[in-house]
Amino acid sequence: KWAQEKGITGGIGNGLFGPNQPCTRAQIVTFLWRAAGSPEPKAMSSFADVSTDAYYAKAVAWAVENGITTGTGDGKFSPDATCTRAQSVTFLFRAIGKLVDSKAEFSDVLTDSYYANAVAWAVENGVTNGIGDGLFGPDNSCTRAQIVTFLFRAYQGK
């Protein structure tokens, strides 16, 4: 409900949200862009797989301009690829996070992994506490419910 009221997502159609559906890279950057107020990007991105008329085109351009993503290589963004929990928290961290002194205490988050600082920030700021049993689940698909929960917790009071 919060995400709908803030204009972050309108669901998947027919009055449905699809909470257990995996979230795509296009959806996540769009959610982040909308949470930031849908700022106009300076220029559109040059990814071969992002059409300028795609619903997520401005969001992708904004995400690139703000250092949230650089794509998946080979001039592509891979908008339809499912985002992992590690990627999702990293995108959110790059959008609004700040480095923290603590380390994430999950057995599946190595201190030298690209997402270690993002996970530490997310834990310290109450964005996530993992999936249980001392695990974060970095390679698990991030569901629509999870990313909206992460956003809600990160943007509380904003």
Regions found by a protein language model. Name each.
Residues 5, 9-58, 65-86, 92-118, ...:
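Feature responds to low-complexity, polar/acidic, surface-exposed segments characteristic
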